[in-house]
Amino acid sequence: MRFLFKTDYEDDIRLFPHSGYYVSYGLLLAVLLIAPYVLSSYLMSQLVFVCIYATVGVALLILTGFTGQASLGHAAFLAIGAYTAAYLQKYGVPFPVYFLAAGLLTGLIGALVGFPALRLQGIYLVIATISFAFIVEEILARWESVTNGNEGMRIKAVSLFGVAVSRDGPTFYFLCLAVLVLTIVGTLNLLRSPTGRAFVAIRDSETAARSMGVNVALYKVKSFAISAAITGFAGVLFAHKLSFISPEMFTLQLSIEFIIVILIGGTFSLHGAVLGAIFIVMIDPFLTYLKDDMPGIIAGIAATFGAGTQAAANVQSKVAAFASLNGLKGAIYGIIIVLFVLFEPLGLYGRWLKIKLFFQLFPLYKRATFKRQKIYVKSERNR
Amino acid sequence: MLDFVQQLVSGVALGCVYGLIALGFVLVYKATEVVNFAQGDLMMLGGFFAFTFIGMMGLNYWVGFAGAVAAMALFGMLAERVVVRPILGYPQFSIIMATIGLGYFLRSVSGMIWGTDDFKIDTPFSQGVLRIGSLVLAHDKLSVIAATVILCALLWLFFNKTMLGTAMRASSENMLAAYYMGIPVKRVVSIVWAISAAVATCAGVLLAPITFIHSNVGLVLGLKAFPAAVLGGFGSIPGAVVGGVLIGVIESMAGFYLAEGWKDVAPYVVLLAVLLLKPEGLFGLHVRKKV
């Protein structure tokens, strides 16, 4: 195993701690760059969604993972970004301008949400962000002169340097990938700056942070604004990818999906946002695959274990009927959330770290390394 | 004026349902500092249980009602055992996520079992109306109001006058200290979940004649019950009901007097206003942390 010998703070905050990182991330980048020429168009489309979800995931990580402010209202920020883009595009504003404008506006609204949120903690903050999202959703449905109400808005393809970029083509994918990579690098830099350290300090203990001279209010508002702005950028891409937006796309359901992204990925590292996004976006094609192919496979297994043709066909039709039940996807979602919270609280990235550590320490790995400590906190009401 | 009273009564009836769901939130919150996002879905499930007993198996209304309450109390214990107990003592956010997951699961599974249609339970008070002058009050709405008042009173007495209630309050203040004092915290939490599921079932059954039972009813009403619980101060039993009634009245008044669209938003606007001006709610306790 490799020991990193650090002699000063600069060593500690390097983006690439050792040369191995260049190799692995270089390889990853190469794979991502050739992906559009290899994968099917459906998978490419899913990959674009992975980029968008991961961008939102990173935004949410800044707020929830690193500043400790839970939010169940990020669908509203996404909606604001998407609608700003659609509205400005209608008046012939070029893409780079409305892209930035959407982020700026969403960031501003995020800051405005952040101010009232200063007084709120824990569950109250969650409820307040839910209410904010509801109000935004209703405004989008009612403000018909701008948002076209429930009929929704169409949004034309991105035009970069006078060339229209198809939403299914590789160029759009590269655009989303670029936004994601820039977001991740920007966030990494943010997190190793004084601002990022203040965020983490606020997450770990607000009282302690304040007594160390951190302006808690300022940094909370900053965190909200930055998180919202990034979500706004993602919203522009989201709108372009779907080419049609309407208020009912930006419901609580979507906010919960974003939370699931970071919960499943892991809330303590930016890797989590990407892994979680892959999981959430890819679960759809996976379930479709299960629905289509699983009955046949199970019938095949039944047949090999000596079941007659009649019985195998019977099994196949039963499984098919079960797989096409209406709410199955929701049930699987629910089970996945509960299982992750119960058994893998550090998320997929935590699992990856555990596996890595297992091989690094091979015979000496012990499970207690990652054991969560129970804190039977005193009442939050006395906080 | 007559319109106003009519709106007021239907607002109060609706508000009582919110209040009953909010009661469930408050009970669980009081005992464990956990916010149960699946509370609305427990209500929905209770309604479906009652529908199964009464509508499908043809039992007497009261027998079916009691059966549904008992079944749901057991189910509440089960849900607590499986989903909440293993993560008790961990950050609140993970528990919230777990209950959101539970809610998803319950919604989908009940959609699979009972289908996605609207169901109606025939109750003894479905038909009758009470006439006071030219005011017409439906019995089903009055039944909701009466049941809420009774339940609220019973629960308040339970929490403040019985030993078990005191144990629950103690474990909510400080779980570890309560444990040291000989309170079986795990069993207490389990009982709280049973009670809150039972209360949710009452809400579901009483609600059935008013809004019907379908698999999404819990989500819709559960989210409306949040403003109620916050308005009353998360953690106060009378507060939950008062908050629920206020939210119900605000909603029905906004639907009647304000432009279209306000009806759905008004509770949340009120909620945000309350959070900004008086985050501890109307009946809440607020103590600053002393270092």
Role assignments for model-derived ranges:
Chain B
Residues 14, 136-214, 237-243:
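Helix-loop-helix "hairpin" substructures at the membrane interface of multi-pass membrane proteins
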Residues 47-52, 69-75, 102-108, 147-156, ...:
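Hydrophobic core segments of alpha-helical transmembrane domains in multi-pass membrane transport
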Residues 22-31, 50, 75-76, 80-81, ...:
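Alpha-helical transmembrane segments of polytopic integral membrane proteins
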Residues 4-56, 82-90, 94, 231-237:
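Single transmembrane alpha-helix segments in multi-pass membrane proteins
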Residues 86-161, 188, 253, 258, ...:
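Transmembrane helix-bundle core of multi-pass membrane transporters
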Residues 18, 22, 58-70, 190-271:
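Transmembrane alpha-helical segments in multi-pass inner-membrane proteins
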Residues 58-102, 109, 242-247, 278-279:
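Alpha-helical transmembrane segments within multi-pass membrane transporters and channels
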Residues 38, 62-63, 93-94, 163, ...:
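Residues that define the loop-to-transmembrane-helix transition and helix capping
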